[in-house]
Amino acid sequence: MNINKIALIYNQNSKHLAIIEEIKKLYNYCKIEEAEAIIVIGGDGALLHNIHRYMHLNIPFYGVNLGNLGFLMNPLDTKNLSQNIHESTVSILNPLLMQAEDISGQIYTALAINEVSIFRKTNQAAKFRIDVNGIERMSELVADGALIATPAGSSAYNLSAGGPILPLESNMLCLTPICSFRPRRWHGALLLASATIQFKILNTNKRPVNATADFQEFNNITNVTVKSTTDTPIKLLFNKNHTLEDRIIKEQFGG
């Protein structure tokens, strides 16, 4: 990939400043608004926050992992960083578009790269109805909550909640309950990425529910509608021998 203008984002309070200084010497970095790609140094959280902040620029992101898991990141390799970027492969992620309404009628709209989730706000389990493409599919789910995950996000919170990992090119979404109480044996559903999913919260006064789109949280929600959108494609760069698809496969075999 022919990339000449690169911007660099990092946490100035990072404990890895010595490594960051090495990376800073590799390029004559430009302003973010002038960049053809953005390098983000940190972990998955730093990458997600900066994707949300700069996705409107429609340029690719290359993550360098200095965090823990770093599922969406590339391993630290300062010696070959320039070569790795220019030989990198591109993965296109289509985020989820969430529209949520709270008890006052306020409407919120947000994008999620990993997942949209709803969850109980108090000690009482949440109760909600699930519609898919305008058709009621479950009249009442009693659970701590539920989430809808993209393929890229299926190995994160979704996997911890018992949901399956989706191949990146599967064109599907995971609908996964969080600690389902009734129906107790329901483990969720796989849906086409073209599906529109709606959660209708029941007993909102006694059983309040919050909703999140990645790290953005909204309180006292009564309705949540979620669908995948191709209007804002996100481009992630990965080393040619360390692609996101490979990581998703390895994760399923304990890698």
Swiss-Prot record:
Keywords: ATP-binding, Cytoplasm, Kinase, NAD, NADP, Nucleotide-binding, Transferase. NAD(+) binds at residues 44-45, 49, 114-115, 144, 152, 155-160, 216. Its EC number is 2.7.1.23. It catalyses: NAD(+) + ATP = ADP + NADP(+) + H(+). It is an enzyme of class 2 (transferase). Its main location: cytoplasm. It is found in: Cytoplasm. The active site is at 44 (proton acceptor). Disulfide bonds: none annotated. Involved in the regulation of the intracellular balance of NAD and NADP, and is a key enzyme in the biosynthesis of NADP. Catalyzes specifically the phosphorylation on 2'-hydroxyl of the adenosine moiety of NAD to yield NADP. NCBIfam families: PRK04761.1. This is NAD kinase. The gene is nadK.
